[in-house]
Amino acid sequence: MKKVLNKYSRRLTEDKSQGASQAMLYGTEMNDADMHKPQIGIGSVWYEGNTCNMHLNQLAQFVKDSVEKENLKGMRFNTIGVSDGISMGTDGMSYSLQSRDLIADSIETVMSAHWYDGLVSIPGCDKNMPGCMMALGRLNRPGFVIYGGTIQAGVMRGKPIDIVTAFQSYGACLSGQITEQERQETIKKACPGAGACGGMYTANTMACAIEALGMSLPFSSSTSATSVEKVQECDKAGETIKNLLELDIKPRDIMTRKAFENAMVLITVMGGSTNAVLHLLAMASSVDVDLSIDDFQEIANKTPVLADFKPSGKYVMANLHAIGGTPAVMKMLLKAGMLHGDCLTVTGKTLAENLENVADLPEDNTIIHKLDNPIKKTGHLQILKGNVAPEGSVAKITGKEGEIFEGVANVFDSEEEMVAAVETGKVKKGDVIVIRYEGPKGGPGMPEMLKPTSLIMGAGLGQDVALITDGRFSGGSHGFIVGHITPEAYEGGMIALLENGDKITIDAINNVINVDLSDQEIAQRKSKWRASKQKASRGTLKKYIKTVSSASTGCVTDLD
């Protein structure tokens, strides 16, 4: 008996009582033969106003062509996106993290309302990646991700530059390290075309995680946006989704606990973004896999940082692809017993089978260090707890900034206040900069602090100050930084009670973050604290404040 591949779409196309549905489909130029084909949603996060996303419509057409060669019916649709790079440092960043959940909601909505049988999702930027994955997990219909791809490095006066060079140019100009003319040249040459930010920032981090999970094709995460290889990846979409339909392989068959462990190992080795903690927690929630921030610490305790990527290192993703790409790194880790090779992937094969014929990394490469010569012996993503963060926080400690910082609190109730303080010389060596009321509810939207960290680095204070916040950090942030502090200030967490001059210790060796205050003093301050007014009174941000969970549970919006 022939297997039914259109088991969802036939609800509309073959049921005589759905005449109006069929009339509208005929009106889209479908014919009689099309009515019996499996319908594949092709969900692109295309929009013109961002280098990460500007080319995705073209990729979606390549995917549609590939799907239809396999006697399937491709149905393209778009969802929204927010460019962190464009909105960074403004109130627009409040909309960034919540766009992840809106993307998941909208893809789930279109796929469910229109009864599509499978999904090929095409994200390009930071929050696009987990948003598409959360939708795949919720729907649990055959599907996979095609990453829009990474950007090529910019070049200025013979030297490679990227988006973080542009962010740091303002601080460098303020401190006299570069001229205004050099700043202008930097921002005009940092982004040479389509593709996601080139270092191990959030988009590339999540692309690596998705490939390690088995939810994208091999090499997807390291192939550049404008390469022939990215077109070839799109050309494989039809046979890939048809195979998934025929074998009835669904996301929950692939996104298992062991697969998430593979993802956590790879992003640790790669030196990935702190945002991966939030996003992997949210992705795991979408498939009912029990994952917690403590699991990240367990992985960090036994996994080294090997990749020398920007922002703290030298290289970008295009450099890695030139020497073998992400699969070559995974093959090295598999040989070392650090990955679960028996995990199923969207090829229909196991991870180990996918990697069997992948070439090894060159012995003399300088991008990926050998296991016996790591950049850092343990993971850079450290989960810190203590009286400042009883429910946890996430530190990004590469080792270059040290592992212990003791200093005095310099407290700001917004990102803007802190930026003004740096500009006027009110941030000094030895400060623990505290930026609060920037959490999921308080921000709202838990905005990223790339502007403050870039300003600190550009001003030459990167080795001399620490920054803690209930907000997030961009994948482009580096320095001695601790984010995701929970409970957040808006909910009366300890970060709301800190005052200028408080002595704070950040210890990434023992995983603690404490303020030197007695329980009596803390209780006294707590009794005086009053909740602040919601920053959003209408619309999507108000709904987000009411539904979002804490950073330690992934900032998801569909928990009970």
Swiss-Prot record:
Top EC group: lyase
Coiled-coil positions: none
Keywords: 2Fe-2S, Amino-acid biosynthesis, Branched-chain amino acid biosynthesis, Iron, Iron-sulfur, Lyase, Magnesium, Metal-binding
Secretion signal span: none
Enzyme Commission number(s): 4.2.1.9
Annotated active site: 474
Residues where Mg(2+) binds: 84, 126-127, 448
Top-level taxonomic group: Bacteria
Alphabetical list of PROSITE patterns matching this protein: ILVD_EDD_1 (PS00886), ILVD_EDD_2 (PS00887)
Subunit details: Homodimer.
Biological role: Functions in the biosynthesis of branched-chain amino acids. Catalyzes the dehydration of (2R,3R)-2,3-dihydroxy-3-methylpentanoate (2,3-dihydroxy-3-methylvalerate) into 2-oxo-3-methylpentanoate (2-oxo-3-methylvalerate) and of (2R)-2,3-dihydroxy-3-methylbutanoate (2,3-dihydroxyisovalerate) into 2-oxo-3-methylbutanoate (2-oxoisovalerate), the penultimate precursor to L-isoleucine and L-valine, respectively.
Protein name as it appears in the record: Dihydroxy-acid dehydratase
Gene source species: Francisella tularensis subsp. tularensis (strain WY96-3418)
Lineage of the organism: Bacteria, Pseudomonadati, Pseudomonadota, Gammaproteobacteria, Thiotrichales
